[in-house]
Amino acid sequence: MRKRFFGLLLTAAMVACTMPMTVMAADGDSQDFKDENLVVGVWGGTIEEVLRKNVVDPMEEEYGCNIDLVLGGTSERKAKMYAEVDNPSMDVLFLNIYESAQAIADGVAQDVDPSLSNFDSLYDFAQTGGYGMSIMGLGIVYNDELVTDPITSWKDLWRDDLKGKVALSTFPSFEDDAFVDITAQAWGLDLKTQEDEVFDKIAELGSFPLFYSDLDELFLEMKQGTVKAAVMFNSYSNDYVEQGFPVKFVYPSDPGAVLAKDTIVIAKNTKHEALAKEFVNRCLSVETQTAYAEDIYFSLCNKNVKVDDETASKLVYGDDVDSLVSLDWTYILEHESEWTDKYNKLIEGN
């Protein structure tokens, strides 16, 4: 009986080898992805490298499909998604925490599909407004050789020893949008009724040595002491710590570090929905999420991922995830244009 059973298995395997590559897609349906072309809009650099190694190359080899990565920032691909809603040139798009939720609400992106096999492994915050790919904590990075009194709270940025030494990013950006809200919360101001007072408080930081858009430039200025502290993400900061820069990242209190989430959405009218969902499901896997953590220090959305203590120290991990502050991005985006004018005045008066 065992010989006959083995013979049946061998026959089945031989037949399978002569048939097109057919796989069980993320939604549970059998799919043939051979020669399909999936277009994914995503950031470049280390993110591209991790995705190619852990998702793109394995899928292309296994399924016989082709996956094109269109590199760039979120503003360009978001604009294309809205303009091309009826015939999207990109099937999958990586966006930030507020862009993805808005795209779903506006009907240009699909809502999440809970049937994906890795969906239930995501933290709750990663299951809404798009598929959560990674999270970061927005906090403070500072030169710990020049700043001898440790920074522990957001209000510490207003200390006399840091006056005129705090850098902000160019506006608009996630960092600056969030910093407006955080300034209000830290100083007990009502952002909705005391907006001018909030910007007056930001101006009290003194002359700004740098409005950064280039991280290499920022950390060089920090090394030289022109900048002593900056509003920054944990993952980027820890990358420069690894490179030997004399800096330290902290999750400041009052009210806490800000939750930043990179998300994935699928275009509403994609012609490759099953392949797109398979791509997303692979991105959410333990293997890919582990690579995000270990290779580029992006914190995890899959709660089943385990990393060593050294890696964990560089991430928002475990109980720290619950401590991140979520902001009212709907309100922030509604007022971003007027905030831009106020930021420009800060720069002009710099």
What do these predicted ranges mean?
Residues 323-350:
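Conserved C-terminal helix/tail region of periplasmic/extracytoplasmic solute-binding proteins
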Residues 28-102:
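Early extracytoplasmic/lumenal segment of secretory-pathway proteins
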